[in-house]
C-alpha cells in the first residue's frame, strides 16, 4: 500500500458494473435474504400495477432449476424507444440502467414499493439469465439478457393471440457467484 493517494486511486463505477461489484449495497445481503430481495423487487412492480388499478392477476413461479418467473396482467412495461437512449426500448432501459423507471414523477403511480428504478436493474445485474416478455397491443415483445445484463439481441416482436390484453413476465436465474442463497423459501414470497 502506497502513501501516495491521488485521483488515480479513485474508481468511478457506473451502471450495472457497480451493482455486480457491490450487490449487498442494493440487496441488503448476498445470501438467501438477497435472493428473496430479488423476488420482492420484481414482485413489487406487479403489485404497484395492481395498487394503481391496472392489474388484477399476479403469478409467481419458483422453478425447480432455480429460476423465478413473475407475471402480471398489468399495462406492460413500455416497449417504445426511450428518448434519452436512442435505439433502446424503454424495456431495455428499465432492465439495464440504474434509476430508470416510471415511479419518480408521480404521474404513473401514486404509491410504489421497491427500490424506485433500481430493483429490476439490480435483479438483471445479479443474474446469469433474465428473459422479459411484455404483451401490448396484441404483440408479444421479448428481450433476453445473460451474464449480468448483456442483451442477447434486439427486442423481438411477434403476434400474440393469448387471453391477456397486456402484461409483463420476468424470468431470471440469480448468479450463484454473486447471490449465494440456494433456495427461495415459499413462505418469504
Annotate each PLM feature.
Residues 1-8, 66-90, 101-186:
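GHKL-type ATPase core
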Residues 1-43, 92-95:
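Bergerat-fold GHKL ATPase/HATPase_c domain
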Residues 57-64:
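Short beta-strand/loop element within the Bergerat-fold HATPase_c
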Residues 33-57, 119-126:
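Conserved ATP-binding N-box helix of the HATPase_c
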Residues 18-21, 25, 48, 52, ...:
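Conserved helix-loop functional segments at active or binding sites
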Residues 51, 61, 161-163:
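Sterically constrained small-residue positions within well-ordered secondary structures
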Residues 27, 31-35, 50, 107-110, ...:
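Short, surface-exposed helix-loop/turn micro-motifs enriched in polar/charged residues
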Amino acid at each position: 500500500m502506497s502513501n501516495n493517494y491521488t485521483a488515480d486511486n479513485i474508481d468511478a463505477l457506473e451502471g450495472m458494473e457497480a451493482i455486480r461489484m457491490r450487490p449487498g449495497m442494493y440487496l441488503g445481503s448476498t445470501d438467501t435474504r438477497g435472493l428473496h430481495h430479488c423476488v420482492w423487487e420484481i414482485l413489487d412492480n406487479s403489485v404497484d400495477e395492481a395498487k394503481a388499478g391496472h392489474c388484477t392477476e399476479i403469478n409467481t413461479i419458483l422453478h425447480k432449476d432455480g429460476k423465478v418467473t413473475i407475471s402480471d396482467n398489468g399495462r406492460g412495461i413500455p416497449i417504445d424507444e426511450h428518448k434519452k437512449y436512442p435505439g433502446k426500448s424503454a424495456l431495455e432501459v428499465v432492465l439495464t440502467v440504474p434509476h430508470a423507471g416510471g415511479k419518480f414523477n408521480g404521474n404513473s403511480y401514486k404509491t410504489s414499493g421497491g427500490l424506485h428504478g433500481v430493483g429490476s436493474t439490480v435483479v438483471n445485474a445479479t443474474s446469469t439469465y433474465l428473459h422479459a416478455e411484455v404483451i401490448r397491443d396484441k404483440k408479444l415483445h421479448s428481450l433476453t439478457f445473460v451474464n449480468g445484463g448483456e442483451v442477447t439481441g434486439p427486442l423481438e416482436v411477434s403476434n400474440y393471440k393469448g387471453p391477456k390484453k397486456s402484461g409483463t413476465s420476468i424470468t431470471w436465474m440469480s448468479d450463484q457467484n454473486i447471490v449465494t442463497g440456494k433456495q427461495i423459501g415459499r413462505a418469504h414470497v
